[in-house]
Amino acid sequence: MGTGFKGNSKYYRSIGQNVMVTSSKYRYVNGRFGESSPHGDQSTRHIVSSDNLATAKDFYDKIAYGGIEQKYGSNMRITRMADGTIITMRVVSHTDGTPVVDINIIDSTNPGGVKKQKIHFVQGDGK
């Protein structure tokens, strides 16, 4: 575990402070990123990309900027934001093997409109 805030932010940030920059690059509608997954409910999402791992890392770095990150081996990173939101990135998900970012707002004091969701980054002809 390093010291300071993710991305060398000078301040401990909440998820709501990162929505605008993240949503300028990734589809964001009604508190959810990406598209509805054909195999899940509204909280299971997917973003299609020609380089799904690089896209997942970019998304995670933007949405978790300014949080406190802990690394767990080579597969998982967990970031706690100032508002209590927990953002987890796994390089390989347990369900389908794709990279996944989980946004958990259960303990958030101010999620800034973001809803609880799990986003799978799927290899394809996306951006």
Predicted regions and their residues:
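Amphipathic, interaction-prone secondary-structure segments
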Residues: 72-94
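Low-complexity, glycine/serine/proline-rich disordered segments
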Residues: 1-71, 103-127
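Histidine-centered divalent-metal-coordination microenvironment in nucleic-acid enzymes
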Residues: 76, 97-104
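Solvent-exposed loop/turn segments at secondary-structure junctions
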Residues: 93-96, 107
